[in-house]
């Protein structure tokens, strides 16, 4: 989980999702942290946007203030897309490959593919890989709406999200995260 309130306040929502789903995946794997060679374990995380809430709230606070350039010292660390991979690696003591894929809606898929290939190429034996996003707020909704990327089927929520339908008209914005534990013994190459 996220631990104490202090830690939650230091993490953007997209990073909170990442930590929680990584913990769930690790617990589900049945692995024991102390039995893992940290030098052969890594984290590859995907996020297309990163800490949008942090960027938005800090910018609004600055804009409505007296013009003094005073930002929270955690402003940049909270919003950069690769911060979840760092937090997860530190939590589990993983010192192997650690990076983030940023490729829009495919970021999480690319993270999983990169983890698979890093195992195949003998760069590591185990990865926590996945992705998270948290952009359901004014600039996220407004930005995707301005691009005309959101579904306009507001009258029927059951049909609004239809990505494979020939009559689709956009996507439904959501947030959350997902993670898998990939390990050498389960990949048959």
Report each predicted region and the residues it spans:
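Acyl-thioester C-C bond-transforming condensing/cleaving domain
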Residues: 8, 27-37, 48-187
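Short, small-residue-biased leader/transition segments that mark boundaries at the very start
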Residues: 1-6, 189
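Acidic/polar N-terminal loop/beta-strand segments that form early-domain functional surfaces
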Residues: 14, 46-48
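Conserved catalytic motifs of the protein kinase core domain
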Residues: 40
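N-terminal amphipathic, basic-rich helices that act as targeting or association modules
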Residues: 10-24
């Amino acid at each position: 989980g996220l631990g104490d309130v202090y830690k939650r306040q230091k993490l953007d929502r997209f990073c909170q999702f990442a930590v929680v789903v990584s913990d769930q995946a690790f617990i589900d794997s049945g692995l024991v942290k102390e039995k893992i060679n940290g030098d052969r374990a890594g984290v590859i995380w995907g996020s297309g946007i990163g800490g949008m809430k942090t960027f938005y709230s800090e910018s609004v606070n600055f804009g409505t203030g007296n013009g003094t350039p005073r930002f929270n010292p955690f402003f940049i660390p909270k919003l950069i897309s690769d911060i979840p991979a760092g937090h997860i690696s530190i939590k589990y003591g993983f010192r192997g490959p650690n990076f983030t894929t940023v490729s829009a809606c495919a970021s999480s898929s690319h993270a999983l593919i990169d983890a698979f290939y890093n195992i195949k190429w003998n760069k590591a034996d185990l990865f926590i890989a996945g992705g998270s996003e948290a952009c359901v707020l004014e600039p996220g909704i407004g930005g995707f709406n301005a691009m005309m990327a959101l579904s306009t089927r507001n009258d029927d929520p059951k049909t609004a999200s239809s990505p494979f339908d020939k009559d689709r008209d956009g996507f439904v914005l959501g947030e959350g995260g997902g993670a898998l534990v990939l390990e050498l013994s389960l990949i048959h190459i």
